[in-house]
Amino acid sequence: MSDLFATITTPNGVKYEQPLGLFIDGEFVKGAEGKTFETINPSNEKPIVAVHEATEKDVDTAVAAARKAFEGSWRQVTPSTRGRMLTKLADLFERDAEILASIEALDNGKSITMAHGDIAGAAGCLRYYGGWADKIHGQTIDTNSETLNYTRHEPIGVCGQIIPWNFPLLMWAWKIGPAIATGNTVVIKTAEQTPLSGLYAANVIKEAGIPAGVVNVISGFGRVAGSAISHHMDIDKVAFTGSTLVGRTILQAAAKSNLKKVTLELGGKSPNIVFNDADIDNAISWANFGIFYNHGQCCCAGSRILVQEGIYDKFIARLKERALQNKVGDPFAKDTFQGPQVSQLQFDRIMEYIQHGKDAGATVAVGGERHGTEGYFIQPTVFTDVTSDMKINQEEIFGPVVTVQKFKDVEDAIKIGNSTSYGLAAGIHTKDVTTAIRVSNALRAGTVWVNSYNLIQYQVPFGGFKESGIGRELGSYALENYTQIKAVHYRLGDALF
């Protein structure tokens, strides 16, 4: 093992070289202070490897590299060339899919099957934005015969990006794709719980033809490296995915520093509403997927299931049966649906919420306990007999815990659905088109799924209302986060006076 790379063999037999350093200006380097931190395998609570920790000085170095690239030759690279680079990066992700999926299962604990889905989604996202690179156009605006007016969509500059641990590589692609397509440079910080896949992805940056300094990948802690990014006077924009609590601090830091542009994709407490006329088999399947997918570690998880009175008892019985069928265990087993939570901290936090629900008088219909004795595994948990004001029904738990609540009619469903401070997503299950449209229009949520849940597609915008964020990820709308509009007025006529 060197200081900058380690040979790792994952439990499914994949052997690869894992970068450990900070990827700055096209090379892996040690941190300025020589600090490292361990990343933990959540399946067995044992260290995997130690990676270099970025400090404020390292952030300064990465930002300087990004600024140099942005002000230098990168600005002369044509949009079509940028697009080809992203497409090449997508190809490399697909080439190394088995390695990348294995890293995610090892470092994050997600099912290897689900991890392969993440890699495919990340590659697709990069390829999608590669296609957009040469299709971002301004307008000509006709005001009179003596003036030519037009607009240009120009890159913002150096972008700081802070990504979460629940979808490490997918979020890496969500952030990198639109930023590079529009001609920006990037300093991206991986989550301290899951740095490995982002560092491996950095290792193929040069192979994709992306010049040194354009993408810089650092590992470190939010309170140090993340804070340095948020406060940095030479970062023009910051993008963050994570908790609403941290999102507030980033917004404050941006305001206190250089008023950098900010996009935030934050928490949720999303309602998944099931009406009497719903196809119950379909609704049960999507409700189960909506909350227990990715171990409940989804910002848009359908963590509040609202069921109309006429089918409530039947739905509860069926949901209990379905939740018990979810295989919890080894993420490298192909039939595993739910692996461990990502960390001891997250495990403890979820168990505290479960205990709070019990103490508040909610009924544990399924689960409510630790799964096994090793690793951060939690049983799929279903609470009934809940009220809207309960803590477990108001705060984001971010784990395999769902509440099920009864409602009377459309108005009641809308009222309960909108009764939290969040507004990221919602689901509606009904055969009535009028009901679906009426309720989807009334819910204050950035994404509404009808007769499905958790189907995020990179061509479609994603983001929240209320305290669930600012701006949109994905689709063409994400490009707006990484460009600024310049208006040019060209006088064609004679002098004004």
Swiss-Prot record:
Family matches, as Pfam families: Aldedh (PF00171)
Single Gene Ontology MF annotation: aldehyde dehydrogenase (NAD+) activity
Positions bound to NAD(+): G242, S243, T244, L245, V246, G247
PANTHER family: ALDEHYDE DEHYDROGENASE-RELATED (PTHR11699)
Similarity section: Belongs to the aldehyde dehydrogenase family.
Organism whose genome encodes this protein: Aspergillus niger
Residues of the site described as Transition state stabilizer: N166
UniProt entry keywords in alphabetical sequence: NAD, Oxidoreductase
Protein name: Aldehyde dehydrogenase
Tagged with keyword NAD: yes
GO aspect biological process, one term: ethanol catabolic process
Catalytic activity: an aldehyde + NAD(+) + H2O = a carboxylate + NADH + 2 H(+)
